[in-house]
């Protein structure tokens, strides 16, 4: 039987603090036998404005957030479903809210970009 963990956490405006909290919870899940753990949407940052997300957005396959996810997955031998990670969209002025699945070898094996069909003011 395989064990999956669903992580619940309250994200703060500090990305480093949120990554530390997420690591602690992922580590606990792995120690309890989980082989896969899902982090919540906005686990990295609960910003006050859209600009907050732009300030931490990364290019696909590059940046400290994605490096942290890969390293954490390898270190804990854990598949991670990474809630949402703000990624830059080439040639566009918007971000992708990317749900990334990282295997225990630290490789992104799939990604889903959340899209909104309308904007609300």
Language model feature labels by segment:
Residues 1-5:
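Extreme N-terminal starter segment of soluble prokaryotic enzymes
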Residues 8-15:
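Short polar catalytic/cofactor-binding loops
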Residues 15, 24-105, 109-111, 119-120:
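Cys-nucleophile CN-hydrolase/nitrilase-fold catalytic domain and related Cys-dependent amidase chemistry
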């Amino acid at each position: 039987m395989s064990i999956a963990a669903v992580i619940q956490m309250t994200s703060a405006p500090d990305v480093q603090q949120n990554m530390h909290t997420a690591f602690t919870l992922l580590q606990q899940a792995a120690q309890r036998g989980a082989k896969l753990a899902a982090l919540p949407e906005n686990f990295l940052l609960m910003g006050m404005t859209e600009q907050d997300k732009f300030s931490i957005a990364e290019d696909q396959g590059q940046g400290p957030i994605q490096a942290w996810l890969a390293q954490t997955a390898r270190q804990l031998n854990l598949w991670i479903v990474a809630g949402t990670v703000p990624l830059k969209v080439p040639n566009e002025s918007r971000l992708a809210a990317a749900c990334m699945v990282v295997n225990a070898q630290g490789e992104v094996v799939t990604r889903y970009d959340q899209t909104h069909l309308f904007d609300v003011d």
